[in-house]
Amino acid sequence: MKTIRQVSVHGGHSKEYCLHAEDLLEDIIKKYIQEGFAWVGITEHCPPLNDDLRYPDEIKAGISKKYIEKRFKKYICQVNEFKKKYSSEIKIFLGFETESYDGYIDYTKELIKTHKPDYIVGSVHHINNICFDFSRQLYGKAIKSSGDINQMYEDYFDKQYELITSLQPAVIGHFDLIRIFDTEYIKRIEKRDIRKKIVRNLKACKKNNLILDFNTRALKKKAKEPYISRSILRKAKELGVRVAPGDDSHGIMDIGTDIKTGVKILTRAGFNTDWPVPDIYTCPAQ
């Protein structure tokens, strides 16, 4: 029987660099090694563009953009150190996770130019500059900003398409995160206008040879299935889009648990379990 390598294309959030995470980054890496992972992408959130666009927990804690930038520089240095320190035990990729608020394209290119990651995870957490996935309250606020929930889905996938085509990130994070607080998402993603945008985005991922993060953190949050939803996953398989597991770990307890369920789902869906390794990000910063 074939042994399937454990990998995570999106993970490694730690309390040193993310207020809503737990545990030290080095302990998290040691846990990946203990669990037998072949490789992992350490992909912390990038700093905010300005103080107004900090995460709600960062605003509450009173930490500034300047502080977060300084902390991010330390993160980059530390991951590069750990890449060397643990090179005989695990392959570590240095990455970071993008945002999607106004001005993010040029800002992300500048971050890439400055910090030289191995790759980035392109994620959409904001609709109309509202961090919709942080709480039900903010999700509701994002719906109002779009007009209704169906339009919010369309706005989300339009923003994701913009991200895909402008930055070509090696990995697309939690493709359908927009469903996070929507109990009717299974029906909603089949609506014609929304579905057209989903398929358009999948085709763009295929064209640019991007990898979809099969994000199992959704299971930890008691969702019915990982991001990507089953019907979208089937379409990705049909189109030949590359997919790899991502635990989106925010602490030691997230490592080596739900990702096994994700691997089983991908195996049953017929995906190649010789997991694709992300291409090093090559989009020029202009």
Outline where the language-model segments fall.
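Hydrophobic residues within beta-strands of alpha/beta enzymes
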Residues: 40-42, 120, 172, 212, ...
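Mid-to-C-terminal alpha-helical segments outside catalytic/metal-binding sites
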Residues: 254-286
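Conserved, mostly hydrophobic/aromatic
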Residues: 32, 120, 174, 212, ...
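Non-catalytic positions within long, well-ordered alpha-helices that form the structural scaffold/packing
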Residues: 33, 113, 164-165, 237, ...
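Extended hydrophobic/aromatic segments used for targeting, binding, or gating
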Residues: 214, 222-245, 257-260
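An N-terminally biased module of ancient metal coordination in phosphate/nucleic-acid-related enzymes
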Residues: 1-102, 106-107, 181-182, 188-192, ...
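Charged helix-capping and loop-helix junction motifs
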Residues: 22-25, 189-198, 225-234, 260-261
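Extended substrate/RNA-proximal surfaces in nucleic-acid metabolism proteins
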Residues: 54, 61-205
